[in-house]
């Protein structure tokens, strides 16, 4: 009976360790995914800012060409 208790304890312990490792890997992959999404959002906002400046640059160039 003592052998069965030790075996059961070992199985439960190894299962918990395995579960803990899997949860940690899942958490790390979710963090990486969130960081990647945040980087993508920042890149898109930078692109939008640059695209918004194009009409301003065109009007500045046309104003300079009218002066010269």
Curated annotation (Swiss-Prot):
Matches recorded under InterPro entries: Frog_antimicrobial_propeptide
Biological process according to GO: defense response to bacterium; defense response to fungus; innate immune response; killing of cells of another organism
Signal peptide: 1-22
Chain ranges passing through the membrane: none
Start-end of Acidic residues biased regions: 31-41
Subcellular location field: Secreted
Keywords, in A-Z order: Amidation, Amphibian defense peptide, Antibiotic, Antimicrobial, Cleavage on pair of basic residues, Cytolysis, Fungicide, Hemolysis, Immunity, Innate immunity, Secreted, Signal
Expressing tissues: Expressed by the skin glands.
In-chain residues carrying the UniProt-annotated modification Leucine amide: 67
Region (Disordered): 25-48
Pfam families in the cross-refs: FSAP_sig_propep
Any one annotated GO CC term: extracellular region
Annotated propeptide span(s): 23-49
Superkingdom of source: Eukaryota
Entry function: Antimicrobial peptide with activity against Gram-positive bacteria (S.aureus, MIC=8 uM) and fungi (C.albicans, MIC=32 uM). Shows anticancer activities. Shows weak hemolytic activity.
Family: Belongs to the frog skin active peptide (FSAP) family. Medusin subfamily.
Additional remarks: The primary structure of this peptide is identical to that of Medusin-L1 (AC P0DQK9) and of Medusin-AS (AC A0A5Q0MU22).
Full protein name: Medusin-C1
Phylogenetic placement of the source organism: Eukaryota, Metazoa, Chordata, Craniata, Vertebrata
């Amino acid at each position: 009976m003592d052998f069965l208790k030790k075996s059961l304890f070992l199985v439960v312990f190894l299962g918990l360790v395995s579960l803990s490792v899997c949860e940690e890997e899942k958490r790390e992959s979710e963090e990486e995914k969130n960081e990647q999404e945040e980087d993508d959002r920042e890149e898109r906002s930078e692109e939008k800012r640059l695209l918004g400046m194009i009409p301003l640059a065109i009007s500045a160039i046309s104003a300079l060409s009218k002066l010269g």
